[in-house]
Amino acid sequence: MTLKERITFLTTPEEVDAFLSAHPRAAIFKAGTCHKTSETFREIEPLLEARSGLPLAVIRVVEARPASNRVAEVTGIPHESPQLLLFKEGRPVFDRDNWDITAEAVGGALDENYPGSS
């Protein structure tokens, strides 16, 4: 299954709660409509593709602001877009936004928080 086939799109606060409850180890990518979103996702896509066991949710912020706000509410991490959050044991362990979403930063966080995971 490809990464794009594995993506769960979250549109409501209830979907955020259900996703995080079902997947204590997961990634959430908040996508805006600017070029930063597509460029940052393209940079980290191979890393996420290689972690086939890591559930990935995407929130299209313009269309699903309440879902994005729910992530900020439950994590205490202010909303940004684009933004990548990694969760371990149901808690956020990594947060990067905008141009700080790099292959180097994300790769290191994946290796640190999910060693040996694919």
Ranges and model annotations:
Residues 1-24, 114-118:
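N-terminal leader/targeting and pre-domain segments
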Residues 75-88:
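Structural micro-motif
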